[in-house]
């Protein structure tokens, strides 16, 4: 049968990772796949290590969280695809890698982070009394490619509405805890 290595992104038992894990288990059961779940504690370096270990085991497929970004994952995915391993990304897109390997099964399951951030800001403006000249605090991950597009959109939409935004970048220590 088919073997899939699947990085849930988080830690065993965390809220988001459990949802992703349960979906992967259900899909594997539906397709008759052997599933190897990996937990990276939201650490991009650990995600890369897990990917290298997965490639060494030569599964049929690997599902990654794109948090490390195209620069880090791209060459590794290139090598895996050359070995015949199908790779795909969830949660955080790898647009350059996907463009290169779409024809060999590389896809993306998740949201468009900019659209998501824009929708959130529009809803905040609709539900609150924020108006031109008011201040809002936003924290996000603008430093991280793709994931940062959500915070970027929130800031842009609020500023377009005349709201002064006080922005704080989320530290890596806080980012690894999905509860926060």
Describe the residue ranges of each PLM region.
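A residue-level marker of the well-folded mature domains of exported/periplasmic proteins
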Residues: 1-180
């Amino acid at each position: 049968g088919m073997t899939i290595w699947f990085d849930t992104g988080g830690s065993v038992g965390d809220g988001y990772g459990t949802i992703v894990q349960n979906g992967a288990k259900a899909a594997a059961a539906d397709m008759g796949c052997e599933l190897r779940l990996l937990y990276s504690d939201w650490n991009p370096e650990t995600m890369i290590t897990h990917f290298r270990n997965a490639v060494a085991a030569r599964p049929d497929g690997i599902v990654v969280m794109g948090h490390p970004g195209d620069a880090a994952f791209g060459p590794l995915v290139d090598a895996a695809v050359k070995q015949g391993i199908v790779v795909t990304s969830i949660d955080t897109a790898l647009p350059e890698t996907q463009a290169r390997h779409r024809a060999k099964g590389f896809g993306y399951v998740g949201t468009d982070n900019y659209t998501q951030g824009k929708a959130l800001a529009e809803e905040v403006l609709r539900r609150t009394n924020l108006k031109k000249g008011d201040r809002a605090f936003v924290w996000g991950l603008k430093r991280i490619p793709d994931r940062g597009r959500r915070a970027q959109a929130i800031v842009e939409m609020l500023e377009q509405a005349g709201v002064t935004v006080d922005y704080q970048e989320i530290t890596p220590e806080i980012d690894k805890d999905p509860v926060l």
